[in-house]
């Protein structure tokens, strides 16, 4: 699969060529910094909440929840499929569900375009680095904590899969929420990073809804789970 991103102003163009389709997907990217609040400032209750919860997260190692956070850290279509297919109620793979797989790739590309400017602007240090602890997985870019990119894509995936299979919305959205919380358990994000990620994920999904090409992919995906 070949992916190419052409950014012009606030317009993102994602070109994806696969065995089943060649689509040109264009969506507008709003300035996320103008929408979400900045990270909590030191001395505020929200900041103290971030510190308290994140510090406590380093004491839940060797638990099932910690192991789930490690698994959820797999940032790839394979990882997303593994995280969501049980809640989705249908297996997800490049071979069996190529349209859904293509959507996961599109979301992965789009997430970086939506979150990277804010991450670079706020330059927030991740919890494991701040507290001199070890994260549940090896993590680079220690100053890109806000907002959470994993949460953004996890929430957007949950919204998208719920549109494809609405009969499983309860299970899918619960899993999407857990996917975000895994970032706190992992020690790589503060609660406010994750909360911002849920919002950015919703914004990203709303922008994708304006794309006729994306809607056509959704319709193909709906047909896949009927087979």
Predicted regions and their residues:
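Hydrophobic alpha-helical bundle signature of multipass membrane enzymes
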Residues: 23-186, 210
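Short alpha-helical linear motifs
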Residues: 123-128, 156-158, 194-202, 222-225
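Boundary at the C-terminal end of the N-terminal hydrophobic targeting segment
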Residues: 19-21
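Bacterial N-terminal signal peptides
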Residues: 8-15
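Positively charged n-region of N-terminal signal peptides that target proteins for export
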Residues: 1-4, 193
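C-terminal membrane module of polytopic membrane proteins
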Residues: 205-227
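Interfacial helix-loop-helix junctions of multi-pass membrane proteins
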Residues: 178-209
